[in-house]
Amino acid sequence: GQGHECDFLTVGSMGHSSSIALGIAMSKKNEKIWCVDGDGACLMHMGSMAVLASRKPDNMVHIVLNNTAHETVGGMPTVAGNIDLVTIAEGCGYPYAVCVDNFADLDKELKAAKEAKSLRFIEVKCALGSRADLGRPTTTAIENKERFMERLN
């Protein structure tokens, strides 16, 4: 399988990945930065969306996997099924925001995002449920941070 050498796994810190990704996008302007958030994490730190949109990094894609639950911490429901994250992203000032609910549209949006020269928000509606063999990180948070920082330099 694919390793996580280039990933910064923010396990246990729901909502901070978009802020971290913004900082990286601002310092690595020649690299495409992909931030994958969950709906629960996005909702926990929704103010980050306003900050992201105000900075408009043209090399960043913000993807929110919306299964309407805090799945990794027990599956408690979120309110993401009752609100419109795309409208919120647009209201915050994202230049492009879209919601997809099938693989064909997701593939199309990811290909377009790869080539785009502007901040993009992609909400992916998905079902609740994760792989039975989905593991946890095998490194400590400190090791993960250090490896990621080495990769950035």
Protein language model regions, located:
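Thiamine diphosphate
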Residues: 1-67
